[in-house]
Amino acid sequence: MSLVKLIEEADERGLAASGLACLDRCLPLLAEETEILRPLWAGVVGGEEDWPARLSASREALDAVGGPAPDVTTALVRTMLGAAPSEWAAGPLRTWADTCSVVALEIHQQLDAVGEDGPAAAAERLARCREDTGAVTDAADGAESTDGIGPLAAGELRRQIAILEILAETAGAAGVRRALDLSTEGQRVLRAVVSRRARAGS
């Protein structure tokens, strides 16, 4: 099933976890402390009762964190959390999860720096991969896909799909725990990329 279809069919828990996972994996671009959002994962488990309060606390925690000089990418990461709905309802959560999916893929594609045909063409490739069930196979090994997205973006696509599948198949806290583990794997990948770039620029 395509990523777009999985988002369309996900329930509130799956949508909240999917959006949060996208944001969580991008945190290394913003802060050295990459467990800031762990309490919000508990909010996903708690659902309607816990989500609003934990979301508010997570925003305050992220605002208090110092990080690299602001740029377009770090602003996007902050905006992802700022746009999260406090209402535990499928409609707003689906809109947020879909936006987070696109933004996270765009960030990973920028770090891949694959192709020289401009941002519009890159966005078109990502949109095609989100709607293409065959993109799952291409992304499975984290290698550059046949649609021209780089290995980082392909790995991010794979994780987004896998997390939504896990949450659809595994109920309760167990599914959220597995989604968090998979997201943490992606976070480590991006943190390594950020570290390499920092060393290269020093």
Predicted regions: what they are:
Residues 1-21:
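N-terminal leader/propeptide segments of preproteins
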Residues 5-8, 82, 183:
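General structural signal for secondary-structure boundaries
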Residues 16-172, 178-181:
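Structured binding/interaction patches within domain cores
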Residues 165-202:
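Low-complexity intrinsically disordered segments
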